[in-house]
Structure formats: structure tokens, C-alpha cells
């Protein structure tokens, strides 16, 4: 296996066509086809399948291309630094469910390292996309939660994708609302008291199974339910409609502001919030620093305990 073959495979996966990839690589199509066939025979894996839509990656091919991109990018870093004498920025990317504390931890980590020598990316997104981003190497780390309801299904998916989940903290469930809500001053709230107020839930797109919901008690039959795509819209709905959502109780006023509060839900439900990463791939210095920043929020989790 050569670096050239890896570059060829990556180009084919991005072009979706042997003919187009050959043009981009400035080689003949038969030569490219032979190089890909030799690579597949050497590693014993079928990387591509032909279809009416062109060349498609197989599941094994998707995983291989993810690793191939890492190898090629590392080579390019070495080449730029030691051959071309360029100063190359180190990269770090994280994907997460909609957690303000995870975003704020990212902010604090970036402040430590600065932007001159590093290139950062943060993706606050849907549950399945968090998993997919880590699987495909788009992000080094994913932040999400497990509980008794979704643990078996998601853990099985993690295993299929060669991913590992590590718990950071475990906490009870809280009702998040604005401070002007009629129930905001209560010490605890039960589900019956919330019946007349709209429950706000993050939209999960085509992966809208209960197991991918970002909120616990996803199978509960709410009388009023509103789906939203982003946190800003959800906060506006809390104020405008006295809406609420269920959360971890980790308050982060730095980003959401001081107009909101979390009240304990009368429930035995627990959330296990942690990080997802690729099995066998070491976490980078930037990744570890980010996790260190998240760990600082353990003490801010209402009623939580550290794992």
C-alpha cells in the first residue's frame, strides 16, 4: 500500500466517478482502475461499488477512507513543516448535542491556545450527526448523553461504528424554563403540572426515533409539543409561550443569559453525559484539554456526582 494509492482512493470517493477522478489526478482511467483494484486486493476489502449513480463507497470503504484521510493529512503536515518549511495550523473539531456547557468549555479551551497556530471547529447538531461526525473523522470527540432507555440501542450502534463512550458525569433531570414561567419558583415539578405548557424538543431530522431524542422521557405523550432546530429559537419559545424543555440542570449563564432557570423534575430518571471517540485512536492534546474544561462543569451540575 502506498501513499499514492491512498490519495487515489480519496479522490475517487470524493469525485464519485472513476472518469472524473482520473481527470483530477491527471492519469488515465485504466491506470486509476488498476491502482484501486490492486489496493483492494492487497487489503482484502472492497472499497467501491458501481451503480447507476456512479461509484459508491462500501461500509468498509467509508471506514478505510476515514483512516486514509488521516494518514494523508499527517503526511501533508510533515511535508509542509519539514520540506516546504511552512507553519501549519493544528486542527481540532468537536460535535455535540445542544449543551451550553459543552460550547462554553470549547470557548475556554480556544482561549488557552489562541487562533494563530490552531484551527478549531464546533458542531452543535443532531444526535445521529454527532455519532456520524466522530465515525467519519469529521470530529475527534462527540458529546452526548445515555440513559436507561437509549443506552442499549446507542451502545450497539457505537460498537458497530467502532466507537467508545466514556461517562463524564451523571445527573438527574431538570425542567429548563424562563424565570417568568408560572412554575419557575417551585422547588420540584411533576409532569402533570407541565401538561398545559408546550414541551420544546430539538428536531432530529430523518433519525427521529425516540432513541435519538436529546431529551429524556421522549416516549411521554405530551399534550403540547413543539420541535425546534436551534437553541436561540427554543429560548424565544420559552419566553413567548411559557415553553419548557428537559435538561441536565447544568446552568451556563455565560451563553444563555440570566433570564432562565432549571427546576428539579420529580422523577427517578438519570442522564449519563459523556464523550464519544474512535476506538484505538488516541485523543489529541487539544482534545484532552477540551475534556478537562468540560470536567470543570461537574460541580455545576445540580445534584450530579462525578464518575
Please provide the spans of the model-predicted regions.
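Flexible hinge/capping segments at coil-to-helix
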Residues: 157-199
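Beta-alpha-beta core module
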Residues: 160-166, 171, 232-281
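Alpha-helical linker/hinge and terminal dimerization helices associated
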Residues: 42, 64-86
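Central regulatory/effector-binding core of bacterial HTH transcription factors
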Residues: 89-152
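Secondary-structure junction motif
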Residues: 102-108, 147, 151, 190-191, ...
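Short helix-boundary/capping micro-motifs
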Residues: 10-28
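A short LG(V/I)-centered, amphipathic sequence patch enriched
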Residues: 40-57
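Hydrophobic hinge/microswitch elements
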Residues: 135-140, 145, 204-261
Amino acid at each position: 500500500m502506498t501513499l499514492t494509492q491512498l490519495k487515489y482512493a480519496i479522490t475517487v470517493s470524493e469525485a464519485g466517478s472513476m472518469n472524473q477522478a482520473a481527470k483530477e489526478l491527471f492519469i488515465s482511467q485504466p491506470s486509476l482502475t488498476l491502482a484501486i483494484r490492486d489496493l483492494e486486493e492487497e487489503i482484502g476489502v472492497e472499497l467501491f461499488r458501481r451503480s447507476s449513480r456512479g461509484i459508491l463507497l462500501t461500509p468498509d470503504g467509508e471506514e478505510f477512507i476515514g483512516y486514509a484521510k488521516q494518514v494523508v493529512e499527517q503526511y501533508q503536515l510533515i511535508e509542509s513543516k519539514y520540506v516546504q518549511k511552512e507553519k501549519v495550523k493544528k486542527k481540532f473539531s468537536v460535535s455535540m448535542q445542544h449543551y451550553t456547557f459543552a460550547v462554553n468549555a470549547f470557548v475556554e479551551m480556544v482561549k488557552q491556545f489562541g487562533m494563530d497556530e490552531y484551527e478549531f471547529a464546533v458542531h452543535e447538531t443532531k444526535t445521529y450527526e454527532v455519532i456520524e461526525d466522530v465515525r467519519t473523522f469529521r470530529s475527534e470527540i462527540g458529546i452526548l448523553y445515555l440513559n436507561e432507555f437509549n443506552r442499549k440501542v446507542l451502545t450497539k450502534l457505537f460498537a458497530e461504528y467502532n466507537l467508545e463512550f466514556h461517562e463524564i458525569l451523571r445527573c438527574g433531570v431538570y425542567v429548563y424554563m424562563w424565570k417568568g414561567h408560572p412554575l419557575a419558583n417551585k422547588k420540584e415539578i411533576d409532569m402533570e403540572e407541565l401538561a398545559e405548557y408546550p414541551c420544546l424538543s430539538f428536531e432530529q431530522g430523518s433519525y427521529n426515533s425516540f432513541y435519538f431524542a436529546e431529551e429524556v422521557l421522549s416516549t411521554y405523550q405530551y399534550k403540547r409539543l413543539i420541535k425546534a432546530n436551534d437553541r436561540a429559537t427554543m429560548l424565544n419559545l420559552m419566553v413567548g409561550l411559557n415553553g419548557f424543555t428537559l435538561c441536565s440542570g447544568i446552568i451556563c449563564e455565560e451563553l444563555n443569559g440570566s433570564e432562565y432557570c432549571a427546576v428539579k423534575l420529580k422523577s427517578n430518571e438519570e442522564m449519563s453525559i459523556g464523550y464519544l471517540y474512535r476506538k484505538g485512536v488516541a485523543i489529541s492534546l487539544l482534545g484532552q484539554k477540551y475534556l478537562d474544561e468540560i470536567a470543570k462543569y461537574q460541580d455545576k451540575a445540580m445534584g450530579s456526582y462525578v464518575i
